[in-house]
């Protein structure tokens, strides 16, 4: 069974709360009516120069060999930045201990499974922003997050997911308490998406924390007996009830190689 699709991102990039001062909104013209911009001759910039500035509006490279053979759900184009809104999860040692038991067991069914490098719960689909939209988009998000309080949630139900194209499969822990708070967050994120004419989140989403992934559709191998055994491991793990109860303190937006944090009250 396919549940809410998830788009994975690498952990590359650095925390960056600063941006340039461009305030252009989607749909704004590049010059005022009645003004005719003077034509300018533009010469191509050598690759050796472009490579010196990875944070420019050209966006990150699209090289599938750098992220395990994953294929983009949309083609990379110059000036387009893949953008994703989510709740980050900082994995503690005990959580990684649980994963050290779960993953090898799942790999007996699907050997190509690999552990996620970073952990999060998605609040949006992956969308494309033009470079000059990033700052206004983040400002709009921050404005809508200011009224939200921190909350606890529990994610202890093992579930199998695929992305929309069925090109990747994920093992995740589904949220079993705190679902209403996540829906409230998504509602506000969706409002921002609508302001920028971007795709909103899925109807009836299954909020979850992805643990491992593989290329291809591996639901047949992972659902059924394997899923039952993985759930038994979680249920029997020492202090699992406490371990899988998580305090949500912030929402984060990743756009290209830039990260923006929005603390909750």
From Swiss-Prot:
GO molecular function: 3'-5'-RNA exonuclease activity; lyase activity; poly(U)-specific exoribonuclease activity, producing 3' uridine cyclic phosphate ends
Stated consequence of mutating residue 208 to N: Loss of exonuclease activity
Effect recorded for residue 122 to C: Significantly decreases exonuclease activity
GO biological process: RNA splicing; snRNA 3'-end processing; U6 snRNA 3'-end processing
Main location: nucleus
Lineage: superkingdom: Eukaryota
Residue sites binding UMP per the record: 164, 202, 206-210
EC code: 4.6.1.-
InterPro entries named among the record's database cross-references: Usb1 (IPR027521)
Signal peptide positions on this chain: none
Keyword Transcription regulation: no
Protein family according to the UniProt entry: Belongs to the 2H phosphoesterase superfamily. USB1 family.
Annotated protein name in UniProt: U6 snRNA phosphodiesterase 1
Species classification: Eukaryota, Metazoa, Chordata, Craniata, Vertebrata
Gene from which the chain derives: USB1
């Amino acid at each position: 069974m396919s549940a809410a699709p998830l788009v994975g991102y690498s952990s590359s990039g650095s925390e960056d709360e600063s941006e340039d001062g461009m305030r252009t909104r989607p749909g704004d013209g590049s010059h005022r009516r009645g003004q005719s911009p003077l034509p300018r001759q533009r010469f191509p910039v050598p690759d050796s120069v472009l490579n010196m500035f990875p944070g420019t509006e050209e966006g990150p490279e699209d090289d599938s060999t750098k992220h395990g053979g994953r294929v983009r759900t949309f083609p990379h184009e110059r000036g387009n930045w893949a953008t994703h809104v989510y709740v980050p999860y900082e994995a503690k040692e005990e959580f990684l201990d649980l994963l050290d038991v779960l993953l090898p067991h799942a790999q007996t069914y699907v050997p190509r499974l690999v552990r996620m490098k970073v952990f999060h719960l998605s609040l949006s689909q992956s969308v494309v922003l033009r470079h000059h939209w990033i700052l206004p988009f983040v400002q709009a998000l921050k404005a809508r997050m200011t009224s939200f309080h921190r909350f606890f949630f529990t994610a202890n139900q093992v579930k199998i997911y695929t992305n929309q194209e069925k090109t990747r499969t994920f093992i995740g822990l589904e949220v079993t308490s705190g679902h209403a708070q996540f829906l409230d967050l998504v509602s506000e994120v969706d409002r921002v998406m609508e302001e920028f004419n971007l795709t909103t989140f899925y109807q009836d989403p299954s909020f979850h924390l992805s643990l491992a992934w593989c290329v291809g559709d591996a639901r047949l191998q992972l659902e059924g007996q394997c899923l039952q055994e993985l759930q038994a491991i979680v249920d029997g793990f020492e202090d699992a009830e406490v371990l899988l109860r998580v305090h949500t303190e912030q929402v984060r937006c990743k756009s290209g190689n830039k990260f923006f944090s929005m603390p909750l009250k």
